[in-house]
Structure formats: structure tokens, C-alpha cells
Amino acid sequence: MKKYITSLVFLLTLCSFAFANVDHKTLAIGESAPDFSLPGIDGKTYTLQSFKNAKVLVIVFMCNHCPTSQAYEDRMVKLTSDYAAKGVSLVAINPNNPAGLRLDELGYSDLGDSFEEMKIRAKNMKFNFPYLYDGETEVTANKYGPVATPHIFIFDKDRKLRYNGRIDDMENPAKTPHSLDARNAIDAILAGKEIAVPVTKTFGCSIKWAEKSVWIDKAQIQWAKEPVKLDTLSADGIKEVLKNHTDKLRLVNLWATWCGPCVAEFSDLVTLNHTYRDRGLEFVSISADDPAKKDKALGFLQRKQASGLNYIYTGDDKYKMIEAVDPKWDGALPYTLLVEPDGKIVYAHQGAIDAEELRKIIFDDPMMGRIYKEPVAKP
């Protein structure tokens, strides 16, 4: 329960209600849809004219990293398939600028919000609608004024805005919504009726406007201030580390300052720590340097801002260290393990890591993953 509450509090700090945004004006009901020219993940460039034959045009601002946006992905796929034959077109736009996205905001996703990562998400989730990128300039987002992801705008055949706000009133896809706001709006437009509730508040992750890059600067300053220590550890101590008597997922790395691949990959490990530590990842580094070189190892860790648990092996028998870590390990550095509570090793790799592969393994672990893992409830 404590872990859930902590995750929820952190998530809410990244989220925004519609009334909280005052910097970017949201398009008003009755206004015309602003034109745009944006690249799609399919290699095409889309404009408003690309959807000229649609009786109803649905534009949803969404992204990869946001857990609320992720919770609605399947519902967007189903909405598209349910209404395609009725002349309704749906297009998704990612408004987020990478400069406004902190590492710890990526902890709820295996992918960031870059154009290339959009292609991966669309393929994995079988998107049946165009997915466009506006993050580089945010020109389109500034015209429409979404306040959160997801935020949906629905236009009639004359491209006048008839509805804007939430998709429905239930974020959790395992539960049934009480109000299918977007579907109700589409049905009303198709039937030539007025929409009962044309504007709703919008819950989700705040738009990552380029000016929010100050958040990243603040995070880097904060991380730089975190103390970095290097403690000693025996072979028996290593065994205790690997038993992992905690409620955290431990990322353990064996390294040394004289090991080129170790030095080259270390920044990636620190990045993974900053990304997932608020969700329960704990980074543990164990240096195989000569204990007499402890100051050199500590200096390296400080330059890398490695504020996790850092140890240096103090024994004079490196083979005892190897056996204490993993009898299957040949002894070559670097060596990286992912250890669940009670010592279950779910990943062990000798040599340089593939950072993106390891990120996915961390995210896919049962202790991480999407916030909502249950089957999707059908509206």
C-alpha cells in the first residue's frame, strides 16, 4: 500500500487538470480547427485537408510516456474501428517537446516521446489511426491548447469545435466508465443534435512545453547535490546484497575504473537509476578496483553523480568476489544483474549492456510496468 501511495503521489505531481493551465489558450467551442502540417509515423505529412471527407474529425493529443495516455490507447484503437464506417476520422498528435521531459517522468514507460519511439509504440499497440509529431516546434499544440495528455477535440463536418476535454470519466481501463463523453459527443454530431456537455475537465500528464526545460535544469542541479559515498564490502557482504532483503528491484553492476566498457556504460546505468528509482529501482555499484585506489573510484562516481549504493570490494581474492556475485559469471567486467526481492536474478549480463534492452527488461518486470496492467474493459 505504501509503495502504491508513493507512486500515486509522484504521478499526480506530473499530472494536470484542465483548469490548471493558464499559459496556453485552449480552443473554444465553435471555433474553427486550425490547420497543421505534421509528419506521421508512416512517412506521410498530414494537414487538415487530409481528413476533408470525414463527417466528424477527432483530434486527440496523446503521448508515449504518460500512464494516463497509455491507459487510453486501446480505447482509441476501438473508437477508431467502431466509427470508421460512420465517416469519423481520428488522428493522434504528440505535442511533447523532449526538452521539457524529465528522466523521472519516463519511469512509467518503456519508451520516451521522440518521433522514433512513437513508431515503436504504434507498432506495439497496433494503432489504426495516424500518429503525428508536433514536439519539435509545438506550433499545432499552441494553436489547439491541450492542457494534458490525453486531451480530445471533436469537430463537425464544417470543422467547428463541438467538444473538447476528456475521453471518458474512468482512467482505469479495467473499470467501466460512467460517462462516455467522447462517444456521446460523436453520436450527437452524427445525429445532428446538440452535445449535452461540450466541455469537460481533462486529467492527465501536463503538456511538455519547450519552456519547461527549466524542470530538467532543476533536476540536474538537484541530482548534482545528492551525496555520493563509497563503502567497503567483503565477499559475504556481496552475498547479502544479492539476497536483496528489500522491497526494491536491484540493479547491480560490477565495474572498475580501469575497465573501458565499464566506464563507457556507467552513465547509462545512472540514467536508468534516475528514471526508475522513484518506482522502486535501486542501483548498486560494486567496484573491483584495488582498495588502495578507493579515492579514484569515488572521484569517478562523484563525476557521474552516482548517488545510489556504492561499494568497493576489499578482499584480496577476486575469485571469492566472483563466486559471491554469481557462480555462472566468468569474471570479465563489466557484469550487470537485475535482482528481485529475496534474491531472484532475472537478468545477468557479462560485457557492456544494451541500455535500451535493459530499460525494457526493467520496465517489463512485474515490479514495474504500466500502472494499469489489467485487461481493458470494453465500453
Where on the chain are the PLM-derived regions?
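Bacterial N-terminal signal peptides
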Residues: 7-16
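A short beta-strand-turn-helix
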Residues: 37-57, 229-250, 270-276, 322-324
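N-terminal, post-signal-peptide region of Sec/Tat-exported proteins
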Residues: 38-85
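Short pre-active-site segment immediately N-terminal to redox-active cysteine/selenocysteine motifs
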Residues: 55-57, 62-65, 248-250, 255-258, ...
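Conserved redox-active cysteine motifs that mediate thiol-disulfide chemistry
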Residues: 63-75, 254-271
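Thiol-based oxidoreductase modules, predominantly thioredoxin-like and allied folds used
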Residues: 87-112, 127-137, 280-294, 306-318
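Short, internal strand/loop/helix patches
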Residues: 110-149, 153-154, 162, 298-333
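Thiol-/selenol-based redox modules, centered on thioredoxin-like
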Residues: 156-230, 332-379
